[in-house]
Amino acid sequence: MRDTENKAKENSVRGLELTAEKINSYSAAEGAKALADLKKQSIHAMEENEAFLMKLLQDNKDTEIGRKYDFASIKTIEEYQKRLPVTIYDDYAGYVIRDIHNNEDNLMTAYPIKVYCETSGSLGNPKIVPMTVNSIHVQQKYNSLISDAIKDMALKPGWKKGRVMTLLESKMTEMKKGKEYGCLSAIFMQEAKAVLPLISTTPAEAIFPDGNTDTRYLQARFGLAASDLVQISTTFLSFAAEILRYIEKHWQMLVSDIETGTINSKIRMSEDVREKIQGKITPMPERAAELRAVFEKGFDTPFATKVWPDLQLISGVGTGAFEIYEYKIRERYVDERVQFYFSGLSSTEGLFSVPLAMGDKKSAIVPHSMFYEFLPVDAQDDFSQIVTLDKVEVGRDYEIIMTNANGLYRYRMRDCIRIMDKYNELPLIQFQYRLNQVADIIDDHTEESAFTKTAMDTALQLGLDLVDYSVYPDRDAPLPRYVYFMEFAHMPEGITREQIRTVVHKNLEKYSPDIKEYIKKGIGAPTELHILQPETYMLYHDLMVFKGRNPAQVKPVHIIINEFHYRFFSKLIEEEWEK
């Protein structure tokens, strides 16, 4: 994105007229170079990754951590592994506090720190991780640019001329002494700000909201008004499913506002923002008529490609817990003309992998992004079983232990990934689940994927329009059991809660067979079900944002592991279904 913005400034100086096509063409060309570079690294991936580690240690030998472990004398991977312990965030919290509050530097990393990023924890104060210019460059080269190269190979040529509905919200806060705090996506949005009006339908007031703005309305309204939309881009596919559902529910208001060039008076935003938005819109009766003609026919068939004939792509995280949203989007909102780009494994802590092809849920690790170690998930924290990338086994599940330019050394990510295949020497991985997102009522170790498959199968079998679900492992009941909370947008007439509950329970027994055995032995109880009020999950998202979380970092709660979440969903049960 930074390269794109710099190109924009250069062209502005030269008096050239920038267009979406020129910007996307430039990004795709640069991305093709980055993709070729990654494929070259794949031939000798282990050597490339070892060289990355040795350079990192030499560059950081004079940091406080580097002196503590004598980075200067480490010459082999084996020495590095013997000298440095496997770490968690608590090992770095003190350094981060000293850096931010005391303005000390050269503690964790010698590289310039651009910003402090928040992680996506569910509650409380998110963990803060420094983001160096080196790591940002890696994200831009291998994540942002490669995605454009893959689009260019897979999509019809017209994609470069169209715009994208951007479902990202940038939030950056200034801390002490000019230091900035936010999330990774905010960095990219800030650096691309100069060209956003050319490539995105979403107005700046929704991408950089003031905290009191109904961004869903702005994303949907401006997106619907644009007939040249070719992409929907989001962090997680849950946001894409949510905005399409919002359009389905509120299309009459949205179309009316587009027709008259107004903003509905009930939409939440400050007068200053309302005035700015009003200055960007004009009545569009012809576009409104096109939209109304589509929506008045109902939603029995997907509407997205009818209102946006040029729509070719939806991109975002769609593996693991987010597969449920891909299914929902494909089932209800788009047809086979729309492709999906599944983002690789990336987080505040670093870039782990990128896909090599459109629609591929496997993604290749990036040897120049971090040094990779892999702990088998079934090793039960026996660190002697840690292996490097050249020793991983296809089909096996691992936790990544990473070392990167942000000052994290042998850091546990607590993510379960599976080695799906290899591209030359590059492992191709796929995210499975968070290691702390496994539930037990006795000793079943039911993974989030089992709960997700249960919910998806139930919706498919009964014709339910599932919005989302959460599961609570109720170990305090007389007999331990799982309690499902489910929100539905549409349900078949005459269906009962007990009918749904019965199917949920049968499906959960299929994906977690221990539950059936517990009931047979008389030590476990059948699954319980509560149906939630409409827009419960939308309310949860808004509440987390109100509590200070960055919108781009709010993830769905599929396994309830704390009292706050349990009380929140319990308070929003639809009482009429409990009778």
Model-predicted segments: where are they?
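Active-site glycine/GP-rich loop and adjacent strand/helix microenvironment
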Residues: 2-72, 80-84, 95, 102, ...
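Conserved nucleotide-state-sensing and coupling region of NTP-binding domains
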Residues: 159-175
